[in-house]
C-alpha cells in the first residue's frame, strides 16, 4: 500500500510553513484528518497497521489515543485488532482520562496517534495510563515523521525523540521532512508559521 500516495490523493500532504504540535517548524504538514474522512480508506490503513502488530505477536487488550488527532486512527486500529478503544484529552492543558473511561491494573495498551513526530503527546497519554495501573506495550501511528525509531525501518531515532527505545513503534511509513527549531528556522525569514492542528486547536 502506497501511504504517501494516499496522503497526496487526499490532498493531505501540505506544503508551506507550518508550526507542528511538537513545536518544530517544517515546510510540510501531514493532515491525517483528510485521509481519515474516507471510512473505507481509514479501514484499509488500520488493517495494514494491525497486520504489522499481529505479526509481532503482541498481546494487546486496548488501544488508547490522545485527542483529537489520534482518535479516528486509534478507533479504526482497535476495530481491526478486535479490542476496545479509549482516549485521553487535555483539560487545562493537562492530559486526562475522562468520560467514564477506566483501565484495569496491568491492562496491556497500545497508544495510537495519527502522526508521530517526537512522540510527546503519545508519552503524555501513556503516562496517564501508567499512573492508573496500565501496562504500555507499544505505540502505533499511520505515519512517522522520522524522529522516532519505527519498527522495520532502517532509520535511527533522532534528537528530540520522546518514545522509549525498549517499546516498538508501528507505523505504515516514514515521512522525513526538514524540521527546524523556531529559533533557527530559515522559513521564518520570509513567512510566519501557521498551525493547521492539532494540539491547542
UniProtKB/Swiss-Prot annotation:
Say if the entry is tagged with keyword Calcium.
Answer: no
Give the cofactors, semicolon-separated: Mg(2+)
Give me the residues that bind orotate, please.
Answer: 117, 145
Q: Gene3D superfamilies, per this entry?
A: 3.40.50.2020
Top-level EC class as recorded in UniProt: transferase
- Reaction(s) this enzyme catalyzes, per UniProt: orotidine 5'-phosphate + diphosphate = orotate + 5-phospho-alpha-D-ribose 1-diphosphate
Name the UniProt key words of this record, in alphabetical order. Answer: Glycosyltransferase, Magnesium, Pyrimidine biosynthesis, Transferase
Q: Name one GO biological process term.
A: pyrimidine nucleobase biosynthetic process
Instruction: Say which domain of life the source belongs to.
Output: Bacteria
Q: Where does 5-phospho-alpha-D-ribose 1-diphosphate bind?
A: 113-121
InterPro entries tied to this protein: OPRT (IPR023031), Orotate_PRibTrfase_bac (IPR006273), PRibTrfase_dom (IPR000836), PRTase-like (IPR029057)
Q: Which PROSITE patterns match?
A: PUR_PYR_PR_TRANSFER
Q: Does the keyword Oxidoreductase apply?
A: no
Subunit organization: Homodimer.
NCBIfam families xrefs: pyrE_Therm
Concerning its family, UniProt says: Belongs to the purine/pyrimidine phosphoribosyltransferase family. PyrE subfamily.
Name-wise, this protein is Orotate phosphoribosyltransferase
